[in-house]
């Protein structure tokens, strides 16, 4: 094309193969390997230990990449698989974290013409069901706040996160952990969702943010009718258990949800947590 007003010339490349609109995602793929996240998923998650199909690493990494790409629903994962350039990068990356027999199976599938390089929405939904314990639903009482007990796979996810926190602390040591604790009201139109205090159906996860490291230390997904202060002591205790080595001082920041006598007394009693002393 001829040069216009600006000193720029445009050239049309007839070869469209390998183009991608997701050029930033491979950096996160590399980070996942460097941080040991891929290895942590493989060593801790056991959803797909037995059986054919997508491995734990493939599904979890696909979901992470989907969130980074701006996906808002499981169905959006199809957009990743439709990006030819990204798929080529993903295929090469997948071979790096697979075991030998898994690598052979995947290469054999590609030779046979298998097109999918990311799990389908159906496969992802089937995978996510493993983190739901239907038996826990029998414990619900209408009109009361209820938090299901995490099943085995949810506990395994926590161990994956623990490994990532250890990596961050090793690269950027912090002796202080200021834990910002607050709930986030997330509106939803899901039929089974419950109403929040704001008057609409929502979910209200309780999050613990590690201010010095700039990341989520702990989170608990909750129904919309569960108050932020409900069992806040237990959540903070679980967050403390995730702190990696090297942390010597802990502070907790909260809104009125944290103004509970039991909670405040526990933080002030250094005998309850001698490794950190009084928690401010």
Model-predicted segments: where are they?
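Dynamic "connector" segments at or just before major functional cores
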Residues: 1-201, 207-225, 233-245
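An internal, acidic/charged active-site-proximal segment
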Residues: 214, 221-280
């Amino acid at each position: 094309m001829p040069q216009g007003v600006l000193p720029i010339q445009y050239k049309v490349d007839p070869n469209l193969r390998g183009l991608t609109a997701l050029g930033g995602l491979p950096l996160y793929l590399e980070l996942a390997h460097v941080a040991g996240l891929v290895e942590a998923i493989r060593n801790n998650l056991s959803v797909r230990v037995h059986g054919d199909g997508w491995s734990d690493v493939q599904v979890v990494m696909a979901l992470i990449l989907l969130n980074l790409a701006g996906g808002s629903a499981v169905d959006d994962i199809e957009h990743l698989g439709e990006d030819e350039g990204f798929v080529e990068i993903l295929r090469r990356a997948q071979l790096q974290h697979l075991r030998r027999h898994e690598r052979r199976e995947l290469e054999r599938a590609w030779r046979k013409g298998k097109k999918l390089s990311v799990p389908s929405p159906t496969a992802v939904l089937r995978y996510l069901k493993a983190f739901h314990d239907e038996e826990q639903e029998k414990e619900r009482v209408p009109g009361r706040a209820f938090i299901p007990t995490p099943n085995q796979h949810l506990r395994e996810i926590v161990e994956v996160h623990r490994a990532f926190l250890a990596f961050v602390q090793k690269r950027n040591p912090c002796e202080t952990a200021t834990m910002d604790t607050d709930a986030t009201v997330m509106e939803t139109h899901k039929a089974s969702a419950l109403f929040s205090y704001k008057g609409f159906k929502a979910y209200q996860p309780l999050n613990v943010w590690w201010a010095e490291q700039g990341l989520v230390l702990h989170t608990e997904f909750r129904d919309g009718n569960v108050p932020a202060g409900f069992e806040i002591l237990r959540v903070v205790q679980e967050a403390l258990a995730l702190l990696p080595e090297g942390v010597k001082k802990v502070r907790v920041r909260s809104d009125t949800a944290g103004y509970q006598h039991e909670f405040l007394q526990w933080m002030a009693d250094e005998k309850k947590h001698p490794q950190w002393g009084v928690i401010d």
